[in-house]
């Protein structure tokens, strides 16, 4: 959050000599700052006195995180040091519901020897969005701009959700990276009429782009709203085309896409390991978001390897993290492959103001 009586302005726009791509977009806020230097001879960005005035012009802001309040959905969960110390946090958890059909792990051909999974530690995540940028660069995601994002046509596979907990002056900001959960009981797979999205033997919710006919049923049935539809054939004008990842299939108009757990990296590592006559070892495969995270909040690996770091953090018998483990929207029984670890606070945040429904969504997710 922003301190009361303080103004925060993003920088980096309003370029005049950046070519066809970035020239003329936005406003250069540097022109608003006085020409003051600190003791080191650098421009002073903080501590500048400013005044806000109403003008007869309108503008709008765009974000991709939706509602700023959780409304009791426990998406960005938190606990306290006291609860963890006394073991109170674990008392409120429940066992998974019993299943009528056998789990895929009991089916021949599934999850042997790999089942890919991820853990995200919300106590480490500071919302810097480096993971989002890394995903764009790794997977050739197009930047659609402000206008298309405003109508729900953003193409980011990973978004940083921000939630405000508390009321009055007693509040905190929580960040939750949200991406495809690679569900073991995914709602998207059952509604695709052409089998373009399916559950592969390694636990990935895979995509076959050539099969997709763009019904968008999968997006409608995704509770996490992480699927993206190509409304256009997005172009990368020169020289931006030279920065594209050649190991990634280029998607065309009318095709749905989403996070793949960087399957291209998995396949490359498996190929190298196969040449050496062995299975992959823990840590050999890193997703782009994991590799870029400066706080190491993301852990990725093979859940079938009990000695892997991700398995130790995600398994229910993990003594260190079991009181912090949870799955987003677990009540839907989608069996996501991503386990979140609760943020740890030093005190309880009072958030029982049920009458406050938060901000309305500034945009609709496509």
Question: Where are these predicted regions, by residue range?
Answer:
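C-terminal, active-site-flanking charged/polar segments
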Residues: 1-38, 44, 214-225, 289-299, ...
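Long, contiguous, secondary-structure-rich segments that constitute the structural scaffold
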Residues: 1-117, 123, 134-137, 141, ...
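Short, well-ordered loop/turn and helix-capping segments at boundaries between secondary-structure elements
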Residues: 2, 13-16, 137, 141, ...
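Ferredoxin-like iron-sulfur electron-transfer modules
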Residues: 100-127, 159-187, 193-217, 228-288
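Carboxylate/His-rich catalytic cores and anion/metal-binding grooves
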Residues: 128-167, 213-227
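Iron-sulfur (Fe-S) cluster-binding segments and ferredoxin-like electron-carrier domains
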Residues: 134-145, 231, 297-309
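Long, compositionally biased charged/polar accessory segments in the mid-to-C-terminal portions
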Residues: 257-366
């Amino acid at each position: 959050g922003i301190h009361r009586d303080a103004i925060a302005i993003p920088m980096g726009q309003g370029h005049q000599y950046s070519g066809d791509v970035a020239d003329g977009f936005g406003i250069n806020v540097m022109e608003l700052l006085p020409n003051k230097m600190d003791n080191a001879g650098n421009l002073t960005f903080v501590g500048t006195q400013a005044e806000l005035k109403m003008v007869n012009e309108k503008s709008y802001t765009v974000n991709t995180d939706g509602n700023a309040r959780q409304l009791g959905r426990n998406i960005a969960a938190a606990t306290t040091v006291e609860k963890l110390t006394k073991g109170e946090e674990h008392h409120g958890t429940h066992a998974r519901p019993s299943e009528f059909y056998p789990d895929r792990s009991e089916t021949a051909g599934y999850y042997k020897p790999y089942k890919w999974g991820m853990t995200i530690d919300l106590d480490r995540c500071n919302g810097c969005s480096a993971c989002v940028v890394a995903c764009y660069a790794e997977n050739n995601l197009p930047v659609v701009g402000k206008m298309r994002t405003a109508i729900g046509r953003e193409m980011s596979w990973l978004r940083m959700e921000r939630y405000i907990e508390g009321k009055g002056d007693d509040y905190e900001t929580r960040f939750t990276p949200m991406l495809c959960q690679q569900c073991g009981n995914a709602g998207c797979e059952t509604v695709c009429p052409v089998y373009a999205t399916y559950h592969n033997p390694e636990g990935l919710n895979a995509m076959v782009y050539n099969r997709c006919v763009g019904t968008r049923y999968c997006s409608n049935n995704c509770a996490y709203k992480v699927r993206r539809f190509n409304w256009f054939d997005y172009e990368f004008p020169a020289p931006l085309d030279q920065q594209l990842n050649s190991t990634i299939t280029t998607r065309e108009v009318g095709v749905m896409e989403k996070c793949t757990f960087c399957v291209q990296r998995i396949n490359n590592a498996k190929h190298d390991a196969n040449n050496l006559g062995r299975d992959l070892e823990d840590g050999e495969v890193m997703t782009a978001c994991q590799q870029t995270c400066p706080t190491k909040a993301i852990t990725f690996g093979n859940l079938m390897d009990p000695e892997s770091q991700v398995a130790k953090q995600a398994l229910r018998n993990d003594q260190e993290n079991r009181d912090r483990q949870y799955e987003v929207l677990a009540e839907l029984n989608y069996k996501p492959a991503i386990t979140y670890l609760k943020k740890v606070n030093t005190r309880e945040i009072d958030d029982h103001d049920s009458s406050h429904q938060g901000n309305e969504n500034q945009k609709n997710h496509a």
